[in-house]
Curated annotation (Swiss-Prot):
The protein's Enzyme Commission number: 1.7.1.13
Entry keyword set: Cytoplasm, NADP, Oxidoreductase, Queuosine biosynthesis
Organism per entry: Burkholderia pseudomallei (strain K96243)
Role according to the record: Catalyzes the NADPH-dependent reduction of 7-cyano-7-deazaguanine (preQ0) to 7-aminomethyl-7-deazaguanine (preQ1).
Subunit structure: Homodimer.
Pfam families recorded: QueF, QueF_N
Active site: 181 (thioimide intermediate), 188 (proton donor)
Protein name: NADPH-dependent 7-cyano-7-deazaguanine reductase
């Protein structure tokens, strides 16, 4: 299915009864082909979706709430278009379920079917809300650099590494990522963490490269994969991991993670802007 056929940018009818058919899958393959990603994938990882506006009725008609987290594997053939995800979650609001476990089971079944892969789902009930943490991405901030930047279309030529120098291990972060929805043109704001082992990457060039996404159109997952492959090709690190946390829209935030080496799943602590 193509993004232009999705609910994005169209008049919306909000369903008030559970409806799994509202989920609109979008194949990953098309966007990957555009940037030269084929099989085998040069990375693995997860897309972490947090849904803050989930509610349903219990068997006695009393509303229940929870925060849902979805872990979608990067190797899944499809992603779910975000507005369709919002409409799907909204369809739970007037539907009775026996338990939170029954809601979680329905979410796992439906989203896994849409993505054509096994999706992990976790629910945080109100009793657990105080345990949820807020934190910023760890690393050396690129935003400390005082530089000129005038290119706002993606330009990987900014990416360079000093291959004659000794390898380093660095974690770099920036809060200056902005891209745009390919269907509606709405801005998407994010923070990015880049961890690598290899020849030292030029910090100013890396920041200018991230800034060059400012007028770029692409879904969150696609932007992170573009960042990953551009750095991998231009700088040739031995190890590379890219993690982005995008601000919330429609009660959902999307946080893609891509890596080419085994490591623990990144924390799912929301940032201040989320």
């Amino acid at each position: 299915m193509n993004p232009e056929h999705s609910p994005l940018g169209k008049a919306t009818v909000y369903a008030n009864q559970y409806d799994a058919s509202l989920l609109f899958p979008i194949p990953r393959a098309g966007a990957r082909e555009q940037i030269g990603i084929g099989a085998p994938l040069p990375f693995f990882g997860t897309d972490i979706w947090n849904a803050y506006e989930l509610s349903w009725l219990n068997a006695r008609g009393k509303p229940q709430i929870a925060i849902a987290t979805f872990y979608v594997p990067a190797e899944s053939p499809n992603i779910v278009e975000s507005k369709s995800f919002k409409l799907y979650l909204g369809s739970f609001a007037q539907t009775a379920f026996e338990s939170a476990d029954a809601v979680r089971d329905a979410l796992k079944r439906d989203v896994s079917a849409a993505c054509d892969a096994s999706v992990t789902v976790r629910l945080a009930t109100p009793a657990e809300f105080r345990k949820l943490q807020m934190d910023e991405l760890d690393g050396l901030s690129l935003d400390r650099l005082d530089l000129d930047a005038h290119v706002y279309e993606t330009d990987p030529s900014f990416l360079t590494a000093s291959h004659g120098e000794a390898p380093v291990e660095e974690t770099l972060v920036t809060d200056l990522l902005k891209s745009n929805c390919p269907v509606t043109g709405q801005p998407d704001w994010g923070s990015v963490q880049i961890h690598y082992v290899g020849a030292p990457i030029d910090h100013a060039g890396l920041l200018r490269y991230i800034i060059s996404f400012r007028n770029h159109t692409g879904f969150h997952e696609q932007c992170v994969e573009r960042i990953f492959v551009d750095i991998l090709r231009a700088c040739q690190p031995v190890k590379l991991a890219v993690y982005a946390r995008y601000t919330r829209r429609g009660g959902l935030d999307i946080n893609p993670f891509r890596t080419n080496y085994n490591q623990p799943m990144p924390d799912n602590a929301r940032t201040a802007r989320q």
